[in-house]
């Protein structure tokens, strides 16, 4: 379900651009991807949990907007990120 703070810190450390980075698009997309993957498993098991499904769709939309922003801003960083995360785009 929700990410633990330790797991979130690991993701931030892995994808950050500089030492104090917590809000770059790469970090935000990586954290959202981990949350989406976790929630996707929950929704797969609990098919009638429409409330969680709506939250999942909201997160996917937010990630899509961040990916679009990153692609417009810096295509090279965008391509590296989707390759590291294994996203289909």
Swiss-Prot record:
GO molecular function annotation: rRNA binding; structural constituent of ribosome
Protein origin, superkingdom: Bacteria
Protein keywords: Ribonucleoprotein, Ribosomal protein, RNA-binding, rRNA-binding
Entry's Gene Ontology BP terms: translation
InterPro entries to which the protein is assigned, alphabetical: Ribosomal_uS15, Ribosomal_uS15_bac-type, uS15_NS1_RNA-bd_sf
GO cellular component, one term: cytosolic small ribosomal subunit
Record-linked Pfam families: Ribosomal_S15 (PF00312)
CDD domains named among the record's database cross-references: Ribosomal_S15p_S13e (cd00353)
HAMAP family associated with the record: Ribosomal_uS15_B
Subunit organization: Part of the 30S ribosomal subunit. Forms a bridge to the 50S subunit in the 70S ribosome, contacting the 23S rRNA.
Function statement: One of the primary rRNA binding proteins, it binds directly to 16S rRNA where it helps nucleate assembly of the platform of the 30S subunit by binding and bridging several RNA helices of the 16S rRNA. Forms an intersubunit bridge (bridge B4) with the 23S rRNA of the 50S subunit in the ribosome.
Family listed: Belongs to the universal ribosomal protein uS15 family.
Protein name: Small ribosomal subunit protein uS15
């Amino acid at each position: 379900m929700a990410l633990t703070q330790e797991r979130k810190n690991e993701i931030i450390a892995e994808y950050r651009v500089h030492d104090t980075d917590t809000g770059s698009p790469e970090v935000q997309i990586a954290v959202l991807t981990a949350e989406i993957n976790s929630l996707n498993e929950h929704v797969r098991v609990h098919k009638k949990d429409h409330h969680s499904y709506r939250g999942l769709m909201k997160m996917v939309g937010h990630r899509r907007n961040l990916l679009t922003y990153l692609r417009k801003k810096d295509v090279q960083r965008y391509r590296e990120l989707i390759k590291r995360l294994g996203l289909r785009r």
